[in-house]
Amino acid sequence: MCIRDSGISFLIFWVEEVWPASRLKYNRVELNGQVSTGWPPNGFNLSNQSIGADNLSVKKISDTDGVLAVWNQEGNFSDVYAQKIGWDGEAQWESNGTPISIEENDQSAISFDIDENGSSAFIVWEDYRNGSDYDIIGLEIDLSSGPTGSEIYFSSDTTNQQKPLVKSVAAGEYIIIWEDGRGYYNSDPLLINGVDLYGSAYVVGFGKTTGVDGIPISVEYHDQKKPAITKYSGEDHLLHWIDLRSSGKEDLANYYAKIIRRSDVLSSTNEKANVTIPSSFNIQSVYPNPFNGQVKFDFTINSPQLVQFNVYDISGRTIVDEIIMSGSKGYHQVSWDGKNV
């Protein structure tokens, strides 16, 4: 893989399969394919060269700060390591990478993202340290200094929670989605036989925005799997996944999606010292009433959190099913124009 800097050079990363272990290396090349002047012909070592490493992922931090690399390395089975690398090729953290998780058994299926300011990153993975089932665990990364604080448990259910996805949706705000094995044990026979999607969020300076085990994102018959999040419009993002709810005698895969919106902050403690912060969730009357082009929903929250936003018609049919990311406590607002009916 390669990451381009602000000019015409590229940092390239590769797996070198040399007995007794595969190892990770990197170098810089110019647009003409030649190794940059002064850089070693055989590249720099990224991982410990004496033990195996794989599942490398690299993302650009900024035009000035270089890149962040995250990978699996053999240790207590499969561990998670990371390294910040400047555009000059210098590793910013400890040699061979800084350990993110070196617990017993496997830590795998790594996902990470960097916020829009390039000041923080968040790494999540599926974790088998208890030896009986997989949980989703994450860790905040301060890109100026390295890992911060303690690991964050997003799940602790006795079923398997696996294949996490993390996406930065604003400065210091991250959405986390995963495949959840509770779908195999639903009490409703119409909703069993496959993994469901659950989710949470993480806000730098606050923490995770839901209780342990998250909130349901899509709980339907058969599998809801392979989630992805892409930029949609403005501050909105589109969460989309493969969905097998229509399966019968044979599996039938469709594509489903829902919008992740960010609410407008009407007031918070960051704006006025005399604002009274609510102690619980509350929604106000919708206005204007009757409907006049667009209606607004005002609500209050006492902490950053994910809010389920649903609109129903008079027959009870769901016509809006969205997730609202509210990144601060206080008074918030979302609007709806009825155009998606």
Q: Predicted segments — roles?
A:
Residues 4-266:
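Extracellular, repeat-based ectodomains that mediate carbohydrate processing or recognition
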Residues 261-277:
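Low-complexity, Pro/Thr/Ser/Gly/Ala-rich linker/spacer regions in secreted
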Residues 272-341:
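C-terminal outer-membrane/trafficking sorting elements
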